């Protein structure tokens, strides 16, 4: 190779590097063989002088072919055992050469599994990893961007200049670069040059931590230095069937549950004051609580209320508070609005120590168009479909994942494993499943593409959901996977091996709509709507249902639960108590949204906090007390939960008394043959002599009454219970003569004796 040819070639290579158009810097930079010797070739934009430091000796480098490519001829190959001394802009510094670290980070097996869509721990390769190469500490960066012309790491390390750290393209569209000396906390992005020359700055899709919005940089973060103390909890969880357990969920949004005054900063353990993250202009003078503060306040509150789980609306990093977290850009990081990843780990750990499980809302159905996120990631429609008829939700302004692409499915499935493994969560609630299952979801005719059979089912999304649930339960057999699926798609909670989607719970949207419609009707007209109350039992055993009164029902002009109820305040409170008690005694696991537990009046506002001042008023204290006691009643009586999904667990006594709007039923469980009788009166008229058939002779203890004065009721009841009489009704020989309070739910337990005074 002639000297002039080498000079021209190096000038061209240098120009490609300076233009950020190089995809193979390892072919040029670092230690290169040359005519039986070695050339040390260092890329150092805007440097004035560069020297090589090998074993204590300094070797001057010269830029013979390009002003930013510095070279020296060496007799021996030093490997990566050298440093570079740089003089630039009057500043001198010493560093290792990034292009001397050539070992592939993504091995052949990793690349193969990722291309198949089966690398369940891909985050251990992708992203930014604090690591050691050849005895040198630094950060390994790894990114999937197969259609990019070039990719650079930009950050504080290079003044956000993409010319300094071009990445090496590997097999499968993987880009890698080890930057020696970089430390935890360093901010970075990827600068991606597309094939047509456009340049984008992107956050790391696999980043483990990101800046607080509106900043968009990713942050180098450790994922392996938290000491968990919940192994007993995890072992017990994964060795039991959650469907056989009581599940009572408090759904909430971390940023609008409670705020703190902005002039009271959070004090870190080291004594430093943390910069406050403001709540919003709608709530001036306030700031968001941190994960440590939520650990102290929220866990105590949820435990006092008696809930078994907290469900957090999405906490994956997201740029816009108004999306409630449902439009994520940082899928592998808890949002930094509230603190650090390890602080969130400590929050989960503390939940487990108090016997509370943690469920996260997970949103694999779509993602936002923000320029720093996944959209048009490498200059192509990499994560989304290119055709907007299958790749865009016009109504939401978001993009739809391309589930047919193996690497995209891998990104999502591994993300699921990541949250369970890295943050010890106990369950997920998958948002908007119907939008994934149907190609024509919210689309007019002509704006969607049928599947290969001409139908509207999204077979790619079906396969993805099946894969995600299969992998989840393979790794975490005691997990909860809850579907928010609003249609009658069959087999949502059937196992994948029989063609189901593989969830183990599904929100019962039908029950929710029927009951809210029913309770919004004037009680005097409820006799014409009895079917709303009873219909859910006709399909109750087609899926494993969870009853949910969620955030979606208290926004966008729908009013909060209390204000959905008709009548004066007394009736509103009584109706609310009756609905909650019917929910807790109806088959199915339970979820309510924050604020419902004490009768919030205003609609939920993501920029405000709850109306905690209402707890200064007795009726709201009464509703909170009712929820506390419902959770005690629920957890202490297996008849209310053990056989939720077994037809033996429920039996109507009478569901046909629409004239009085009264229903009665039994809840039973097989293990101990325990059972309860529930009687509900959904009118404001009391019934002092209402007879209900019972299966056995004996005394029936009144163990719960929503009309108790401690809940704000009129304290009408049955003096602790009623003994049965030989009076045939409802196809039973025995019955009890009850006093039914207005707008109430009563629960009775068989005591096997004629009166409470008998021994």
UniProtKB/Swiss-Prot annotation:
- Write the lineage as a comma-separated list: Bacteria, Bacillati, Cyanobacteriota, Cyanophyceae, Synechococcales
What InterPro entries does the entry give?
A-amylase/branching_C (IPR006048), Branching_enzy (IPR037439), GlgB (IPR006407), GlgB_N (IPR054169), GlgB_N_E_set_prok (IPR044143), Glyco_hydro_13_cat_dom (IPR006047), Glyco_hydro_13_N (IPR004193), Glyco_hydro_b (IPR013780)
Subunit arrangement?
A: Monomer.
Which family, according to the similarity comment? Belongs to the glycosyl hydrolase 13 family. GlgB subfamily.
Q: What is this protein called?
A: 1,4-alpha-glucan branching enzyme GlgB
What is the main EC category here? transferase
Q: What is its EC number?
A: 2.4.1.18
- Alphabetical list of NCBIfam families matching this protein: branching_enzym, PRK05402.1, PRK12313.1
Provide the function of this protein: Catalyzes the formation of the alpha-1,6-glucosidic linkages in glycogen by scission of a 1,4-alpha-linked oligosaccharide from growing alpha-1,4-glucan chains and the subsequent attachment of the oligosaccharide to the alpha-1,6 position.
Its UniProt pathway annotation is:
Glycan biosynthesis; glycogen biosynthesis
Native source species: Prochlorococcus marinus (strain MIT 9211)
In alphabetical order, the GO MF annotations are:
1,4-alpha-glucan branching enzyme activity; cation binding; hydrolase activity, hydrolyzing O-glycosyl compounds
What Gene Ontology cellular-component terms does the record carry?
cytosol
């Amino acid at each position: 190779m002639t000297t002039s040819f080498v000079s021209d070639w190096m000038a061209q290579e240098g120009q490609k590097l300076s233009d950020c158009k190089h995809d193979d810097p390892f072919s040029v930079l670092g230690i290169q063989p040359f005519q039986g010797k070695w050339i040390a070739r260092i890329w150092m934009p805007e440097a004035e002088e560069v020297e090589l430091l090998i074993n204590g000796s300094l070797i001057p480098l010269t830029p013979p072919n390009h002003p930013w490519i510095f070279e020296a001829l060496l007799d021996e190959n030093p490997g990566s055992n050298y440093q570079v001394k740089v003089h630039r802009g009057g500043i001198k510094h010493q560093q290792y050469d990034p292009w001397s670290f050539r070992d592939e980070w993504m091995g052949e097996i990793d690349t193969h599994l990722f291309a198949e869509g089966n690398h369940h721990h891909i985050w251990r390769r992708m992203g930014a990893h604090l690591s050691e190469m050849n005895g040198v500490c630094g950060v390994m960066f790894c990114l999937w961007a197969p259609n990019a012309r070039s990719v650079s790491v930009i950050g504080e390390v290079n003044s956000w200049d993409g010319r300094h750290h071009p990445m090496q393209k590997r097999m499968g569209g993987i880009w890698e670069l080890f930057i020696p000396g970089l430390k935890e906390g360093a901010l970075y992005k990827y600068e991606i040059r597309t094939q047509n020359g456009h340049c984008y700055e992107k956050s790391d899709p696999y980043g483990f931590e990101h800046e607080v919005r509106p900043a968009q940089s990713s942050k180098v973060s450790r994922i392996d230095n938290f000491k968990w103390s919940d192994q007993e909890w995890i072992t017990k969880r994964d060795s039991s069937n959650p469907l056989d357990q009581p599940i009572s969920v408090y759904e909430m949004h971390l940023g609008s549950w409670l705020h703190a005054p902005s002039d009271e900063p959070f004090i870190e353990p080291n004594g430093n004051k943390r910069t406050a993250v403001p709540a919003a202009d709608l709530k001036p003078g306030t700031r968001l609580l941190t994960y440590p503060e939520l650990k102290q306040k929220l866990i105590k509150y949820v435990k006092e209320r008696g809930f078994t789980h907290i469900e957090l609306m999405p906490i994956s990093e997201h740029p816009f508070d108004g999306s409630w977290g449902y439009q994520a850009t940082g899928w592998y990081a808890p949002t930094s609005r509230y603190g650090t990843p390890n602080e969130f780990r400590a929050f989960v750990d503390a939940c487990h120590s108090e016997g509370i499980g943690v469920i996260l809302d997970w949103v694999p159905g779509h993602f936002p168009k923000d320029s720093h996120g996944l959209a048009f990631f490498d200059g192509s429609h990499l994560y989304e479909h290119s055709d907007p008829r299958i790749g865009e939700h016009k109504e939401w302004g978001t993009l739809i994942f391309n589930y047919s692409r193996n690497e995209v499915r891998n990104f999502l499935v591994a993300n699921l494993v990541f949250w369970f493994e890295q943050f010890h969560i106990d369950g997920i609630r998958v948002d908007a499943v119907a939008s994934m299952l149907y190609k024509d979801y919210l689309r007019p005719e002509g704006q969607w593409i049928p599947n290969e059979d001409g139908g509207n089912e999204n077979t790619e999304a079906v396969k993805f959901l099946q894969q995600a649930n299969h992998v989840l339960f393979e790794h975490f057999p005691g997990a909860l996977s809850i579907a928010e699926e609003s249609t009658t798609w069959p087999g949502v909670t059937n196992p994948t091996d029989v063609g189901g989607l593989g969830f183990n719970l599904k929100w019962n949207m039908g029950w929710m709509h029927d009951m809210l419609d029913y309770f919004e009707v004037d009680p005097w007209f409820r006799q014409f709507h009895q079917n709303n109350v009873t219909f859910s039992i006709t399909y109750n055993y087609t899926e494993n249902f969870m009853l949910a009164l969620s955030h979606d029902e208290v926004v966008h002009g729908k009013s909060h639960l209390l204000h959905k109820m008709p009548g004066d305040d007394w009736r509103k409170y009584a109706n609310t108590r009756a609905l909650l008690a019917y929910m807790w005694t109806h088959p199915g696991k339970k979820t309510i949204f924050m604020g419902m537990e004490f009768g919030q009046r205003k609609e939920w506002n993501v920029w405000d906090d709850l109306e905690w001042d209402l707890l200064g008023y007795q009726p709201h204290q009464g509703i909170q007390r009712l929820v506390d006691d419902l959770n005690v009643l629920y957890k202490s009586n297996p008849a209310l939960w053990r056989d939720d999904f077994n037809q033996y667990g429920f039996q109507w006594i009478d569901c046909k008394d629409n004239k009085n709007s009264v229903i009665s039923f039994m809840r039973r469980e097989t293990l101990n043959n325990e059972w309860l009788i529930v009687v509900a009166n959904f009118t404001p008229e009391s019934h002092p002599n209402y007879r209900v058939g019972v299966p056995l002779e004996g005394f029936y203890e009144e163990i719960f009454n929503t009309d108790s004065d401690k809940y704000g009721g009129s304290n009408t009841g049955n003096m602790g219970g009623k003994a049965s009489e030989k009076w045939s009704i409802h196809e039973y020989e025995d019955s009890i003569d009850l006093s039914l309070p207005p707008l109430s739910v009563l629960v009775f337990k068989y005591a096997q004796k004629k009166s409470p005074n008998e021994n």
